[in-house]
């Protein structure tokens, strides 16, 4: 038996494992090869198949039905976590603070929206190039449990909106609720709220 057909199958599989940095970063992920950031395979995957949750971050739920020609522009975002909190930076060049709306909902959703209005054409104007994007933009983020929703602060500088969110102290983070299963003869039990450790 020749080893050549076996090598043709084995070599791509080994390259796939090496590109994904497996098994160091798998950690019980359903998608161990593409779930690890900064790997060759994750970069190739994300270019071809965008993350559906990131796509949903940009879809506004409140678009009116009488606005069929609404234009959504993309606002680029960076989000980092520090020991003290979270910092979200949104590119909003050319906008003033009155053009931007920031909302925090009780279900831990942070929304940033706004509109970049197109310059009105004056009689006699002839555009040679139009590359800047105009229209409404919308980004929303599901905030982690450790964010203090009352601590959100925003500032704008040089076309960048920076949102700062402080972390809750460990004893104030609510853990998952444990629900007991009862049988027909048993009395219903209380719901217990465990603290995250």
Swiss-Prot record:
Assembly: Forms oligomeric structures.
Organism: Pisum sativum
Database matches in CDD domains: ACD_ScHsp26_like
InterPro entries the UniProt entry points to: A-crystallin/Hsp20_dom, CS_dom, HSP20-like_chaperone, Small_HSP
Gene Ontology biological process terms in this record: response to stress
Localization per record: Endoplasmic reticulum lumen
Signal peptide per UniProt: 1-28
Pfam families per record: HSP20 (PF00011)
Swiss-Prot/TrEMBL keywords: Endoplasmic reticulum, Signal, Stress response
Keyword Endoplasmic reticulum: yes
Motif stretch (Prevents secretion from ER): 194-197
Residue stretches making up the sHSP domain: 68-184
Source taxon at top rank: Eukaryota
One Gene Ontology term, aspect cellular component: endoplasmic reticulum lumen
Family named by the database record: Belongs to the small heat shock protein (HSP20) family.
Protein name: 22.7 kDa class IV heat shock protein
Keyword Signal: yes
